Amino acid sequence: MLTSAADPDGIAAWIGHDAPEVAVLSVGQSIDLYKDVGAPADIAERYGFKHLRGSHLVGHTRMATESAVTPAHAHPFTAGRDFCLVHNGSLSNPHLVRKKLEPLGITFETDNDTEAACRFFEWRLREGDDLKTAVTRGFSELDGFYTFLMGTDRELLIVRDAFACKPAVVAETDDYVAIASEFRSLAHLPDISQAALFEPKPEEIYSWRI
């Protein structure tokens, strides 16, 4: 992690030009991003996750089906400052999305379909959309099956595609909101028996302000 008072975008551009062998995972002031290959428990120990403190966390374990098993291809992906996205599913038109966005100055780093979605949202946020508007535009642009979970410095958001093929469950209490693909990932949480549980509806955007 590099900490500097300089403009984050300027630092990222400098690294890309003068040290292209260095991968920039994320830039910003609020969100730290970690990616690696291995068992979740080993990665958590390697980076000292138990010592981290914050208001919200987005995590993802990935079974690669169409792209390489490398940290660069792992989730979360980022779009601009303090934004992260994880994805359960598969997009059928990532190459068309890429073909549309590259002439607009959007840079891609992998062939991962999740990055195509992330770069689409990056473009829309750059054009002035708020996150909900960007996601709504994605309904007509991103083709495939997906559940997207996104985090910013101020917001947590989940959305599923029109068919809602990929599972998701939300638990809400007075103290926390927890989201997972399956309930068994939430079953150990405190007071989970008192939580309001629901599955997000197709193409309905759910968000929580931090």
Where are these regions (language model features)?
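N-terminal segments that mediate ammonia production and transfer
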Residues: 1-210
